[in-house]
């Protein structure tokens, strides 16, 4: 007896050491402290006790520590460190309970008494007394609080006794490893599953509750003293755990895990009930409720105290006949967090509760049972008419017995009261077609329906042509609105007016009676969201010429007179919403989807009609290219031109252009917003003034977008040709050409500018011309362009004579880095017609080829960019050809010399010789 008490005190000391240093000392320091204070045999005993206690939890990895308990190490110090490390590890694993339940576990420090005293006080231990009645015991019973999250309780009517007679307790400092709480009838391995809802959700007022105690083995003499013998269950532990009175047997780890292969899922759930404080008259001498119920056999020896006041284990919330409960209660959390809500199971939906969430209101309201609001359960429908005072969660408190209220009242508040749902967020449009008429089942609902209809009438000015689905979505939360049914046919009115096929928009009555399941509702919801956008309002898809969304005040359907007529008729009949028959309400979602499809088809046809204006683009482009070729030919013609541009002729042409082409898109050169006038076709916006447009692009635009006008392409381009022909031939004036043509074309497009703007524009254009007209003496010398391009284009020879294989004379190697060196040797170039005539001495040499050379200086031409390409293969080919030419030349000279010599010999020598003879 003394040895047992000392052993218990020793284990108390070790566990208190672990408890006090767990959160303040590191793992290594805790192991060192255990090794320094205790012997190997004591540590081995504690490890075996902790191991067998931890094996009560089926989640405990027993095989990891079984090999360690069998291992034999010769060095005692190493073995001691290993045992201490195992103790700390098992202790931490027991508390963590898989890592997920640590925050939910009660942080109580219970005392475990030895078995000899437990049977003496088995009856009296179950009686609950207040702490003030009991005198403190001498064995640290009053020194340590029983709970950090619970009200302080003592387990029995305390008897005045000395410490020698006092039963010894082992404190389970964070003692959740001692609690095998999950009690199944068929000796299921004890689990810590039920503990996760105890501590953080304690009821505010102290509630005496039933004490179930799990025995903690303390017979140290009967334990094996060696570390190697500690794995098998000794006789003392067997006597401790196995008792004929109790149906609990400690099994091996393999047997514990084999229970999962059996039919343990159908075991009945034993749920200890709460004992209310109104039973205080019975508490001193009565038995708890669980002992009165004979169909609940006890599972544990009544020697370790474990208070239950878990809402989850309350039979009100956990009915015994429910055999479909999830194996792990965390599945309820998973179901409650899914988007479309939990799945109804056999009508027990209002008794399903998330574990550990009983004393909290659910932070998110319950998700909709289905997107089809016809299938709302009855208990949720009862929330529509409840008062806010009835919506408080009622839990047992110190002054009342646990009420067995019904399922709908027992549920948390899932929905906001309907009076608060009339005010919607600003970004969400009111959809006057929400709830079906069969759900408007009470006068209160009808009054709210009328109020919402009035609210809809006030906001009719912002009504769009498309309404959303039955729920307005805020995040993933679906809120239900009692809204106006008579608008159910308003959606497909425009489609019916367009196509005239009213029967295609409806289904038969047989199809309407079929209730849609969750999957079809999900897809219908996704279709509506994809068509309508997240707010359920179809954006107007009328795009202007720049591709941006035009700011129209009406949607596509509102602009049609048919839609206005249907809207008026529907508005007249909106007061008869309660008389709207049921098939129309059932057809509502299908008609809404079909009307959206009809709108989409109409929009596609609209776009196709707009695209028809591009059918003749190819022919017009060919005509434009022909005109541009004529322009090039006119530029190449030699003629005397003036340097200054005759702007008066240009201004005289501008009004005629404007009057002749009323459909041209006009915009100020500095304006920012494009304006659509009376052009039915696509019009390209020139809002920025088109300062970067080239001449050809402008001509192309003008030929494309003035096609419906009365002017022909020839008349249209004649002004452009005359303007281009009146420009100086100077390469520096090419910028003037593009600039003036750009400004003149913009001038034709300016109609709203007025005479003041026109004068200002003329002044600016003249200043720009003067800016480009620089005297020759102030111009910087540039690299001259020889006849390379002219010869390359017009020469019949494949290799022009100006192409030489030498680096300095070949224009292929003309580089910007070589320009400075080339200018020193080549002298002053001629950049104007006068300089060219003076330098060449012949004014008749100004030909179309010269203008073509200057054409190559125009950056708008492809030759300007293709001229200076470096081609080393071409250079080697040139050198080879030049060598062949030189060789042929030498051969010809040699042949001529030989022929001359032969001729001299034959003509002179032979007659002389003949004459001498």
From Swiss-Prot:
Q: Which UniProt keywords apply?
A: Angiogenesis, Cell membrane, Membrane, Phosphoprotein, Transmembrane, Transmembrane helix
Where in or outside the cell is it found?
A: Cell membrane
Mark the transmembrane ranges: 893-913
GO annotation terms (biological process): angiogenesis; negative regulation of angiogenesis; negative regulation of cell growth; negative regulation of cell population proliferation; negative regulation of neuron projection development; negative regulation of protein ubiquitination; negative regulation of TOR signaling
The entry's note on the tissues where this protein occurs is: Expressed in brain and in islets of Langerhans.
* Residue ranges with Basic and acidic residues bias: 576-588
Q: Which domain of life is it from?
A: Eukaryota
Task: Tell me the residue ranges located in the Cytoplasmic compartment per UniProt.
Answer: 1-892
**Disordered as annotated region, ranges:** 337-367, 388-410, 461-483, 568-588, 652-687, 706-727, 746-783
Task: Give me the Extracellular side stretches, as residue ranges.
Answer: 914-917
Which positions make up the signal peptide? none
The record describes its quaternary structure and partners as: Interacts with NOTCH2; this interaction increases MINAR1 stability. Interacts (via N-terminus) with DEPTOR (via PDZ domain); this interaction may stabilize DEPTOR protein by impairing its ubiquitination.
Question: What is the protein's given name?
Answer: Major intrinsically disordered Notch2-binding receptor 1
Species per Swiss-Prot/TrEMBL record: Mus musculus (Mouse)
Q: Which gene encodes it?
A: Minar1
């Amino acid at each position: 007896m003394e040895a047992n008490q000392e052993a218990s005190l020793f284990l108390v000391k070790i566990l208190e050491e672990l408890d006090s240093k767990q959160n303040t000392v590191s793992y290594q320091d805790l192991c060192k402290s255990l090794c320094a204070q205790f012997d190997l045999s004591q540590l081995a005993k504690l490890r075996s006790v902790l191991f067998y206690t931890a094996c009560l939890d089926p989640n405990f990895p027993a095989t990891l520590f079984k090999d360690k308990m069998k291992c034999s190490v010769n060095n005692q110090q190493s073995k001691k460190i290993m045992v201490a490390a195992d103790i700390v590890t098992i202790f931490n694993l027991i508390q963590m309970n898989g890592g997920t339940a640590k925050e939910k576990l009660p942080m109580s420090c219970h005392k475990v008494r030895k078995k000899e005293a437990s049977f003496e006080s088995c009856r009296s231990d179950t009686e609950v007394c207040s702490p003030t009645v009991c005198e403190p015991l001498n064995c640290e019973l009053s020194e340590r609080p029983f709970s950090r999250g619970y009200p302080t309780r003592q387990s029995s009517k305390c008897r005045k006794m000395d410490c020698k007679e006092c039963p010894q307790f082992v404190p389970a400092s964070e003692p959740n490893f001692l609690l095998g709480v999950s009690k199944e009838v068929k000796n299921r391995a004890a689990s810590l599953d039920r503990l996760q809802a105890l501590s953080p959700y304690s009821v505010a007022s102290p509630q005496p509750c039933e004490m179930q105690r799990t025995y903690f083995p303390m017979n140290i003499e009967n334990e094996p003293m060696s570390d190697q013998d500690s794995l098998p269950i000794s006789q003392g532990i067997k006597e401790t755990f196995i008792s004929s009175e109790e149906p609990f047997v400690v099994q091996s780890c393999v047997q514990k895990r084999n229970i999962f292969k059996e039919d343990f899922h159908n075991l009945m759930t034993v749920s200890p009930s709460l004992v209310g404080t109104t039973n205080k008259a019975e508490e001193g001498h009565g038995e708890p409720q669980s002992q009165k119920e004979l169909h609940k056999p006890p599972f544990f020896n009544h020697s370790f105290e474990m208070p239950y006041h878990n809402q989850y284990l309350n039979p009100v919330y956990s009915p015994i006949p429910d055999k479909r409960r999830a194996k792990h209660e965390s599945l309820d959390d998973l179901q409650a967090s899914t988007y479309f809500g939990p799945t109804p199971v056999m009508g027990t939906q209002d008794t399903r509760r998330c574990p550990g969430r009983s004393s909290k209101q659910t932070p998110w309201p319950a998700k909709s049972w289905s997107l089809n609001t016809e299938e709302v359960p009855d208990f949720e429908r009862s929330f529509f008419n409840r008062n806010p005072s009835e919506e408080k969660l009622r839990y047992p408190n110190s002054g009342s017995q646990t009420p067995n209220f019904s399922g709908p009242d027992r549920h948390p508040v899932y929905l906001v009261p309907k009076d608060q749902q009339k005010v919607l967020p600003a970004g969400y449009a009111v959809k006057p077609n929400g709830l079906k008429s069969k759900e408007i089942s009470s006068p209160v609902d009808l009054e709210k329906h009328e109020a919402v209809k009035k609210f809809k009438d006030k906001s009719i000015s912002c009504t769009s042509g498309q309404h959303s689905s039955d729920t307005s979505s805020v995040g993933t939360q679906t809120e239900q609105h009692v809204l106006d049914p008579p608008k159910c046919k308003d959606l497909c009115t425009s489609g019916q007016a367009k196509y005239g096929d009213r029967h295609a928009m409806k289904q038969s009555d047989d199809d309407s009676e079929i209730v849609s399941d969750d999957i079809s509702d999900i897809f219908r919801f996704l279709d509506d969201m994809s068509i309508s956008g997240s707010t359920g309002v179809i954006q107007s898809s009328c795009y202007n010429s720049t591709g941006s969304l035009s700011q129209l005040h009406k949607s596509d359907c509102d602009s049609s007179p048919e839609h206005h007529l249907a809207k008026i008729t529907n508005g007249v009949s909106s007061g008869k919403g309660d008389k709207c028959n049921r098939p129309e309400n059932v057809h509502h979602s299908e008609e809404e989807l079909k009307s959206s499809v009809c709108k989409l088809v109409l929009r596609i046809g609209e776009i196709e009609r707009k695209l028809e204006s591009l059918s003749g683009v190819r022919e017009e482009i060919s005509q434009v290219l022909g005109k541009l070729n004529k322009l090039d030919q006119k530029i190449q013609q030699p003629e005397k031109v003036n340097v200054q541009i005759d702007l008066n002729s240009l201004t005289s042409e501008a009004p005629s252009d404007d009057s002749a082409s009323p459909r041209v898109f006009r915009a100020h050169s500095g304006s920012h917003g494009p304006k659509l006038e009376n052009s039915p076709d696509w019009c390209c916006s020139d809002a920025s003034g088109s300062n970067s447009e080239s001449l050809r692009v402008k001509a192309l635009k003008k030929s494309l977008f003035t096609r419906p006008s009365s002017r022909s392409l020839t008349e249209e381009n004649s002004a452009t040709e005359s303007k281009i022909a009146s420009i100086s031939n100077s390469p520096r004036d090419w910028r003037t050409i593009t600039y003036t043509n750009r400004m003149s074309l913009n001038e034709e497009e300016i109609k709203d500018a007025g005479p003041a703007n026109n004068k200002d524009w003329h002044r600016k254009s003249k200043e720009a011309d003067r800016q480009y007209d620089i005297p020759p003496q102030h111009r910087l010398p540039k690299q001259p362009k020889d006849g390379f391009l002219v010869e390359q284009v017009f020469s019949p020879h494949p290799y022009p004579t100006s192409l030489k294989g030498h680096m300095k004379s070949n224009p292929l190697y003309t580089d910007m880095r070589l320009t400075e060196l080339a200018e020193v040797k080549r002298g002053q170039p001629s950049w104007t017609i006068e300089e060219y005539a003076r330098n060449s001495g012949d004014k008749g040499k100004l030909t179309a080829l010269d203008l073509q050379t200057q054409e190559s200086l125009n950056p708008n031409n492809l030759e300007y960019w293709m001229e200076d390409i470096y081609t080393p293969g071409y250079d080697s080919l040139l050198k080879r050809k030049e060598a062949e030419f030189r060789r042929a030349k030498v051969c010809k000279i040699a042949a001529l010399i030989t022929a001359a010599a032969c001729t001299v010999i034959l003509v002179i020598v032979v007659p002389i010789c003949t004459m001498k003879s």
